[in-house]
Amino acid sequence: MVKDIIKTVTFSCMLAGSMFVTCHVCAAGSVVNITGNVQDNTCDVDINSRNFDVSLGSYDSRQFTAAGDTTPASVFHVGLTSCGSAVRAVKLTFTGTPDNQEAGLIQINSINGARGVGIQLLDKDKHELKINVPTTIALMPGTQTIAFYARLKATYLPVKAGNVDAVVNFVLDYQ
């Protein structure tokens, strides 16, 4: 008798489970619409803008008399070619290691590097660009050259003399 009850219960559960699965499958009737758009809104980075050096020059550490003092800015360019007909803007982010004293600046990497200064990046109008923070730049179809500037900025005194080395990458995110 106990065996019969167990068999019956087991069979009933399997039957009920099969009915549930069958009904669930019968009720499924979804539609997935997939849409998209192919645009011509990107550019190629000019070969001369892929790997290059920016010289900031040589300065006496004593010329920095207060935190916030800067050197003259050195211009550099990022060239974009073959910008598509739909291009309007790009979010450009300079990425690198932020300075320990002022997070918007780039940290000097050298073991024997200068101390008390960081590298500041500026846009074409010489407004500060913070490292690792995107900035939107208007673009037009075709070829264009975007000017940027780099300079040293004192973060604390006294500034210690040494080498100035840093690696910065840039990332383009088209809008």
Curated annotation (Swiss-Prot):
It comes from the Bacteria. GO terms for biological process: cell adhesion involved in single-species biofilm formation. This is S-fimbrial protein subunit SfaG. SUPFAM superfamilies: Bacterial adhesins. Disruption phenotype: Deletion decreases hemagglutination but no decrease in fimbriation levels. Belongs to the fimbrial protein family. Keywords: Disulfide bond, Fimbrium, Signal. Disulfide bonds join 43-83. Residues 1-27 form the signal peptide. Fimbriae (also called pili), polar filaments radiating from the surface of the bacterium to a length of 0.5-1.5 micrometers and numbering 100-300 per cell, enable bacteria to colonize the epithelium of specific host organs. A minor fimbrial subunit. This protein is necessary for full expression of S-specific binding. S-fimbrial adhesins enable pathogenic E.coli causing urinary-tract infections or newborn meningitis to attach to glycoproteins terminating with alpha-sialic acid-(2-3)-beta-Gal. GO terms for cellular component: pilus. The gene is sfaG. It is found in: Fimbrium. Pfam families: Fimbrial.
